Amino acid sequence: RSTQGRSSAASDVYKRQRQSMVRKQTRCKNQIKSILFFYGITIPEEGHWSRRFIHWIESIRMERASGDFALKAHLEELKHLRQIIANLNRAILSLSRTEAYRSEVLLLKSVPGISTLTDMILLTDLSDISRFSSLDKLASYAGLVPDIKSSGETEYSTGITFRRNAALRSLLIESSWVAVRKDPALMMAFNKLSLRMKKTQAIVHIARKLLNRIRFVLKNRQKYVPAVI
């Protein structure tokens, strides 16, 4: 079965709509935080954007009616966006059970840290894994090639390159935080890397390892066996 043409399928439309809604949701959350900051209201450290956190925001009363109006308007917008994203997630998950995606989704679900929703976004973005002749080319496409600065005979890695597919890069980083909790080999690698660099830099290296696992299962059509790759 050919994977050509999948990028123009319904999943791609849903994915792009979801990315747009997620960006709007992020802006809306930042606007709500700005309003709270403006009125000197301290935001709790834990539970950001949980149902309890949103109920807490709803209970707040500002000194001015205009502040109450602005906060309520942004909260209503946030709820609306969350509902749209939830509907899009359901639509994408429904597609994952179709013939066009079922086999690849089952393969990718064997990789720690990769959810079904992530599977679908990856498959839509990558389309056909065979178009990437090496891990380096795939990592470059995903924005996971470290920038290198040289000083004499010493080279310094400065982290992720800010090019190529920003959404895919973000997705892989997010999935890597989950993967290090589920895959003993990745957890060991992450802990070792964290001894000589910041955790936010270490997770970049883990994301590349995770991408290698993804490439392996799709290219070889074999489920991932933990601690093998």
In which residue ranges do the predicted regions lie?
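A detector of single, family-specific signature residues
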Residues: 11-229
